């Protein structure tokens, strides 16, 4: 069996996009997704994204399998890629066009902007420990600058969910962090029953930060959209960032705004088609 695909990337966070509008069930299994994402023996990607029929009042449904076969609730860079892929499927891009996308994290609304940019209404952040979820602190409290022991060190962490869990810690130098060693230990820390994404943040100015990320189920990636959103929220909660902030990632920059008007987070960044092809399953 063969399947058509398109590969997109958002700041180097790359995905295999599949037109799954004919079925409510992904056309590829998690095991097959692992093989497709393999950078030596497959197409190579951080995950596989499926465009399924919409439900209720949504236009489409988004499902994702990570490169390890796990299924996250949402992916910020991925949904920007999804929006441009949908525009291609519909016959072309219309600036200002907004899609209502059903995800496991709720309904997300990406809007097509000029020069390949996509602005996404990421919804409101979840801040209580039980919503992350994490067992750090009291379940009905926010987790802000909480002490966490990892790799023989004490880290001050702030936890935020964007529909998926994030653990954010602020450091002096993001490039001085041993991410391959620390990332897995944060991800699998017993304080996070569903594992966690982990962001290391260096504040350059209140409106500009640098970020490196270890993604749950994907490891080190060049960018993470939900992580950038969660990190700005953490920066505001710890009084280190403004609500409008540029996040510099290894793959490029994202513009994040946590609106005081409606408490929603807006993420703007690029998404680009890399190539299309046919894969033999």
UniProtKB/Swiss-Prot annotation:
InterPro entries: DAP_epimerase_AS (IPR018510), DAP_epimerase_DapF (IPR001653). The keyword Cell inner membrane does not apply. The record marks 166, 215 as: Could be important to modulate the pK values of the two catalytic cysteine residues. Its EC number is 5.1.1.7. Substrate binds at residues 13, 66, 76-77, 164, 197, 215-216, 225-226. It catalyses: (2S,6S)-2,6-diaminopimelate = meso-2,6-diaminopimelate. The active site is at residues 75, 224. It comes from the Bacteria. It is found in: Cytoplasm. Pathway: Amino-acid biosynthesis; L-lysine biosynthesis via DAP pathway; DL-2,6-diaminopimelate from LL-2,6-diaminopimelate: step 1/1. GO terms for cellular component: cytosol. One of its GO terms (molecular function) is diaminopimelate epimerase activity. Belongs to the diaminopimelate epimerase family. Catalyzes the stereoinversion of LL-2,6-diaminopimelate (L,L-DAP) to meso-diaminopimelate (meso-DAP), a precursor of L-lysine and an essential component of the bacterial peptidoglycan. This is Diaminopimelate epimerase.
């Amino acid at each position: 069996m063969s399947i058509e695909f398109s590969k997109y990337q958002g700041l180097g966070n790359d995905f295999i996009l599949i037109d799954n509008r004919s079925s409510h069930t992904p056309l590829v299994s998690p095991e097959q997704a692992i093989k497709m994402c393999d950078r030596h023996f497959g197409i190579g990607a951080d995950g596989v994204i499926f465009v399924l029929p919409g439900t209720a009042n949504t236009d489409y449904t988004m499902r994702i399998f990570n490169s390890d076969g796990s299924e996250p609730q949402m992916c910020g860079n991925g949904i920007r890629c999804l929006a441009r892929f949908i525009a291609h499927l519909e016959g072309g891009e219309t600036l200002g066009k907004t899609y209502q996308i059903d995800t496991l994290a709720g309904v997300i609304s990406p809007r097509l902007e000029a020069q390949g940019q996509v602005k996404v209404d990421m919804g409101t952040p979840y801040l209580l420990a039980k919503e992350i979820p994490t067992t750090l602190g009291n379940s009905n409290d926010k987790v802000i600058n909480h002490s966490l022991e990892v790799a023989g060190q004490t880290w001050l962490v702030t936890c935020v969910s964007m529909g998926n869990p994030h653990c954010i810690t602020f450091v002096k130098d993001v490039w001085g962090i041993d991410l391959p060693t620390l990332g897995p230990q944060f991800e699998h820390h017993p304080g996070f029953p569903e594992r966690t994404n982990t962001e290391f943040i260096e504040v350059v100015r209140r409106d500009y930060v640098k970020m490196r990320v270890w993604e749950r189920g994907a490891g080190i990636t060049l960018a993470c959209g939900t992580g950038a959103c969660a990190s700005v929220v953490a920066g505001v909660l710890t009084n280190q960032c403004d609500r409008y902030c540029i996040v510099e990632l290894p793959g490029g920059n994202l513009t994040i705004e946590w609106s005081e008007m409606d408490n929603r987070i807006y993420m703007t960044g690029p998404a680009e088609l890399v190539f299309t092809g046919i894969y033999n399953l």
